[in-house]
Amino acid sequence: EEKVPYNVLKTKPVGIEKSVDEVGHISKVDETLSFQERLKGDFSQRPASITKKTAVKQVKESYSMADLNKMNDRELVETLGSIKWHQYTDL
């Protein structure tokens, strides 16, 4: 072995001796479906959108500042994000 006057790593870093295909995720969790099996899955059916239902409901209503002040933070953010400016009665 060659003598080196400075500190050199004597072992290879972890993973360098393995090919990219052999290196696994650090959690070592086995996937239930392979990549090819997931690609064969039925992607044509999607879950129903909840936002469309709430938008339809909120188009029919108007909101005063008192109504908005009664809402919790999450409900307020969802409402403000889905209603139009003309639905605010106190503006």
Swiss-Prot record:
Superkingdom assignment: Bacteria
Keywords, sorted A to Z: Enterotoxin, Hydrolase, Metal-binding, Metalloprotease, Protease, Secreted, Toxin, Virulence, Zinc
Cofactor(s) essential for the protein: Zn(2+)
Gene Ontology biological process: proteolysis
Cofactor binding note: Binds 1 zinc ion.
EC primary class: hydrolase
Annotated protein name in UniProt: Non-hemolytic enterotoxin 105 kDa component
UniProt source species: Bacillus cereus
